[in-house]
Amino acid sequence: MTLDEIAQKHGTDKSSLNHNYTAIYEPLLEPLRDKPITLLELGWGGHEDPDCGGNSARTWAEYFPHPGAEIIVVELESKNVQPDDDERITLWQGSQDDQGMIDQLAAVYGPFDVIIDDASHLSSKTIRSFELLFRHVSPGGIYVVEDTHASYHEHYYGSMEANENPEKRRRDGEFTMMQFFQRLTDEVNYRGRTELDLFPSRYAWNVPVESIAFYFNMLVAKRR
């Protein structure tokens, strides 16, 4: 089965019936399909119902059949892994921007071949998660941020005005997630300085970013 067929089977909104992220994921992940990868996803889904969610995790578990593959999920809400879920799925409760939890998670399961942020969609948490986790991506691995359209919605701490003018920050003085990743392209294309003119010094670290690709409502950062 294709990734999209598996996604439709499990009811995740990543399929072509909804966001159609599977069209982006398939060529990226197909070379890893039969390997013992470690995939970390932020966000179990299902909102506050403890027995709902996990559709994405089940999709990944079926798409990556290798017995050594691991699917790790971080979720803020209290959730229950269902009795018939694949035993290779592990669920951790915690906040995606909790450094202590992230450090513990990385120490146990890292490095990660694939990291997917499909959690809060709040710019501040999305940026912080990337700061904490990208260093734990395997060389050649990828870090995906889904639903980047949230950067343009006020209720997700976005700002149309800020995104239309990259020099203008949000009202709270911070960047939207799209502004952050747009600036990260400067790090990719202009290496050799510790701080770029348009790049906040607290984001200038020595983690080697190979590339950043922007798609409709989704971006992929690859590590060298």
What positions do the PLM features span?
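A short alpha-helical cap/connector motif
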Residues: 1-116, 120-145, 149-224
